[in-house]
Amino acid sequence: MIIGIDIGNTHIVTGIYDNNGELISTFRIATNDKMTEDEYFSYFNNITKYNEISIKKVDAILISSVVPNIIITFQFFARKYFKVEATIVDLEKKLPFTFAKGINYTGFGADRIIDITEAMQKYPDKNLVIFDFGTATTYDVLKKGVYIGGGILPGIDMSINALYGNTAKLPRVKFTTPSSVLGTDTMKQIQAAIFFGYAGQIKHIIKKINEELNEEIFVLATGGLGKILSAEIDEIDEYDANLSLKGLYTLYKLNK
C-alpha cells in the first residue's frame, strides 16, 4: 500500500493506492499548519478503519505541498507511524516534461508538477492545457512535452470571499450553477455573476492560447470546483477530479 498526500492552501487531500497504483480511497481535511503528526494520524486511522482499509503495511508515503512549513509534520508522520521516509515532490525529481528556454521555474508549485505529470502520462502526444481550480486557479501549457508558460488567477472561493469581506452588506454565497445570468435577488445576482464571469474568463484564456499556439490543443481540468465549471465550458475536453493524486503516484513510479 502507498499513501499520497496532496497539501493545498485550503485542503489536504489524501489518497490510498493499492500495489498496482489504483486509488482505493480518498479523503479531504482542512489545511491547518498547527496540526501535529499525531492529530493527522488520528484522522487517517479513523477514516481508514471506517472504510475497512488495513494500514499495517505501507511501502511509501508521497507528499506534494504548496505549504512548505507543513511538510515536516508529514515527514514525522511517515517516520513515526510507518517507519518510512516520505518522498517529497520537487523539481529535483525526474520529470516527464522540460521547460522551454526563457521560463523562470523558480517557485514552480508541486501541485502543478503532479498535474502536468499525469496529463503527460495520459496524453503524451498532445499539446496540453491544464487548469487546476484550487485556492488559486492555475493553467499550464505544454507543447510536445515542453512547458511554454501558464498563468495564475484568484480562485473561485477567493473571489467570493473578497466580495463578502470587502463590503458591508453583501452575503457570502455558495458557488453553484445558476438557472439564469439574470439574478432576481442579491444572492442570486452574485452567484450568476461569479459563475458566468469566471466561466467567461476561462473561455477567453483558452481562446487566447489557441490563437498564440495556432495548433490543436487538449484541455484538462481538475480541482474541487472544476467539475461545476467544466459542465459550462465546452472548450474543456476532460475533467479529472483525481488528476493530482494520480500524478503523485505516476511521478513516484517514474523516480523509483
From Swiss-Prot:
Q: Which InterPro entries match?
A: ATPase_NBD, Type_III_PanK
Xref: Pfam families: Pan_kinase
Protein's pathway: Cofactor biosynthesis; coenzyme A biosynthesis; CoA from (R)-pantothenate: step 1/5
> Where in the cell does this protein reside?
Cytoplasm
Can you quote the record's cofactor note? A monovalent cation. Ammonium or potassium.
Binding residues for K(+): D132
Q: Which GO terms describe its cellular component?
A: cytoplasm
| Known EC number | 2.7.1.33
What does the subunit comment say?
A: Homodimer.
What is the protein name given in its UniProt record? Type III pantothenate kinase
Q: Which organism is it from?
A: Fusobacterium nucleatum subsp. nucleatum (strain ATCC 25586 / DSM 15643 / BCRC 10681 / CIP 101130 / JCM 8532 / KCTC 2640 / LMG 13131 / VPI 4355)
